[in-house]
């Protein structure tokens, strides 16, 4: 059993070393190149950070960003991707929360980063990689990385993603290796993702949908294609990209799928390799779902549900029939090793025997994350002892979403308790 996500990378490198692991518009890395580059970055960063320390990453996503993430993990730290388009005020709130000693940028983001007023050391990834010529790390660095790995636990943090929540103040969800490994094992097995797949990444790396793209690829030896953001403004470019790169699997925000059908993209082209189409973040309009299913009658369509705080998703529904325009998609069933249930206002269980009654959607299992970074008050409010269990410690996550069971026992999403809305899958 894996205890560190680096085992995903190293296992795939052993089996598929010369296969493309990740590609963007300007670059691609094989599994061997990705691993070696990550080890080089890790050997450099291990001199600058302590184990379990957070490293903020301030750049656009590229193949090198992925090698940086893995390099941070080799150094024993956890990564936190920052959106370079966000206001400096928000970025600085996040940097203050992480209490970072270093900030990693690239040539494109370096000048913008200087204006943040960051007090620690700014490291330019592009400049760092100029010193790297594909060589293996030296024996001293190898020994240093080995010691870090020996001391690592599967409960060590892997990444942090900041959500705004209902207050607009960023909350940093902190997710460990165990939660990620357990979820990705279930996810790839449930949907049959293999080394033959090509995953088309839509989600920004500061959004947890990207976790499924990244680690499903690393786990199985699939190829990860990073789709430029610009493509989602021009469906013809998007469809060309999917077709040219032979993308088989997309795990997108609902709104990204709807862009294609709203602008009649399929009148231009139908990418021929797609066979797994998954979506989350918002309620999927049946009209748009049906338009996609007409184009891909043999593909697997999956409705996914779950907030960042439970490691990506906790339920899934494989669509196996035609839905009418007046119908809603069910949430489906929990992933293996996760329990999903409803609690009423008095913390009593709302089960399928009480159809139509609203309850707060709650989740337990190893996918429940470590809470909010340096925010004990918010953590204590949402990550709580299971009120149905008075026998031993069992932490559950209260999602703040309301759900209900239908007459035939299907679980449905109703609404937020606090009236948040979503944009491109982000809670705002």
Give the residues covered by each predicted segment.
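Hydrophobic alpha-helical segments in the ANL/AMP-binding
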Residues: 9-11, 63-81, 187-188, 210-222, ...
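ATP-dependent adenylate-forming carboxylate-activation enzymes
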Residues: 27, 59-63, 77-93, 107-110, ...
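AMP-binding/adenylate-forming domain of the ANL superfamily
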Residues: 1-160, 175-176, 182, 285-290, ...
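Conserved AMP-binding
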Residues: 59-62, 83, 193, 203-207, ...
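Gly/Ser/Thr-rich phosphate-binding loop
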Residues: 219-222, 247-251, 261-330, 336-339
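AMP-dependent adenylate-forming
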Residues: 4-6, 88-90, 103-116, 120-150, ...
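A generic "structured core" feature
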Residues: 34, 67, 71-79, 93, ...
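Conserved AMP-binding/adenylation subdomain of ANL enzymes
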Residues: 171-200, 208-248
């Amino acid at each position: 059993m894996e205890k560190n996500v680096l085992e995903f990378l190293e296992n795939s490198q052993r089996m598929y070393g010369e296969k493309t692991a990740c590609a963007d518009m300007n670059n691609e890395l094989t599994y061997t190149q990705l691993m070696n580059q990550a080890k080089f970055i890790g050997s450099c960063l291990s001199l600058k950070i302590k184990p379990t320390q957070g490293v903020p990453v301030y750049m656009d996503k590229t193949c090198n960003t992925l090698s940086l993430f893995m390099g941070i993990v080799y150094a024993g730290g956890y990564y936190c991707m920052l959106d370079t388009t966000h206001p400096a005020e928000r970025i600085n709130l996040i940097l203050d929360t992480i209490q970072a000693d270093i900030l990693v940028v690239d040539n494109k983001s370096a000048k913008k980063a200087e204006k943040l007023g960051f007090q620690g050391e700014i490291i330019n990834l592009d400049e760092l990689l100029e010193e790297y010529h594909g060589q293996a790390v030296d024996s001293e660095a190898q020994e240093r990385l080995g010691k870090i790995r020996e001391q690592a636990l599967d409960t060590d943090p892997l990444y942090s993603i900041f959500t705004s929540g209902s207050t607009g103040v960023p909350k940093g969800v902190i997710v460990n290796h165990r939660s990620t490994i357990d979820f990705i094992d279930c996810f790839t097995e449930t949907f049959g993702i293999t080394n033959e797949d090509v995953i088309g990444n839509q989600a920004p790396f500061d959004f947890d949908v990207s976790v499924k793209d990244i680690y499903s690829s690393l786990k199985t030896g699939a190829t990860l294609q990073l789709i430029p953001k610009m493509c989602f403004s021009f469906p013809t470019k998007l469809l060309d990209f999917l077709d040219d790169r032979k993308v088989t699997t997309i795990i997108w925000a609902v709104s990204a799928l709807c862009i294609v059908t709203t602008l009649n993209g399929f009148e231009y082209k139908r990418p021929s390799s797609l066979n797994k189409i998954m979506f989350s973040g918002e309620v999927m309009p049946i009209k748009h779902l049906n338009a996609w299913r007409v184009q891909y009658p043999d593909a697997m369509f999956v409705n996914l549900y779950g907030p960042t705080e439970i490691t990506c998703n906790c339920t899934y529904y494989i669509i196996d029939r035609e839905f009418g325009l007046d119908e809603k998609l069910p949430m489906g069933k929990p992933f293996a090793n996760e329990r999903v249930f409803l609690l009423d206002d008095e913390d009593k269980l709302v089960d399928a025997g009480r159809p139509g009654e609203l309850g707060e959607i709650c989740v337990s299992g190893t996918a429940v994350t470590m809470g909010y970074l340096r925010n004990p008050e918010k953590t204590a409010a949402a990550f709580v002892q299971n009120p149905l269990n008075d026998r031993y410690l069992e932490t559950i996550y209260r999602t703040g979403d309301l759900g209900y069971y239908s007459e035939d026992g299907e679980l449905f999403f109703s609404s937020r308790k606090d009236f948040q809305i979503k944009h491109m899958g982000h809670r705002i």
